[in-house]
């Protein structure tokens, strides 16, 4: 069994690249409740599918009555299987005047206590969580060559509806 420390070290070493990938995802204004943003919801699904395919997942985009679902599999027979669920859609940004910076231009911010956070629509609900799981898979595969168990990832685009 692999020690976790090398995987965590790889995550730390690749932090700038991981943040760039997250920021690219956060820049997609995938507002599912506004039909005007349907193309951007599809863009988010396509971006995710490409990211997961590049990591070696068997990936598909599945149509629904609202926005596409991304389903990715990395089977590993004879091992436990993990299912990860998340969503790529975000809430509307109104009222826009309450944002200090454009909501789809993510940035790092430091608060008065010195804590660094990511500011941008979707950073905590739910694109940040989705990318945390994807980056963990990326780091594990970088260190071990394959995931330790079977993994299925389901990411939908209508949770905020």
Regions flagged by a language model, labelled:
Residues 79-152:
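Active-site metal-coordination/substrate-binding segment of hydrolases
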Residues 65-67, 112, 159:
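Short, solvent-exposed coil/turn elements at secondary-structure transition points
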Residues 2-96:
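N-terminal helical capping/dimerization or prosegment-like subdomains
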Residues 129, 155, 159-161:
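Hydrophobic, small-residue-rich alpha-helical packing segments that form membrane-like cores
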Residues 60-61, 152-155:
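Short catalytic-loop micro-motif centered on adjacent basic/acidic residues
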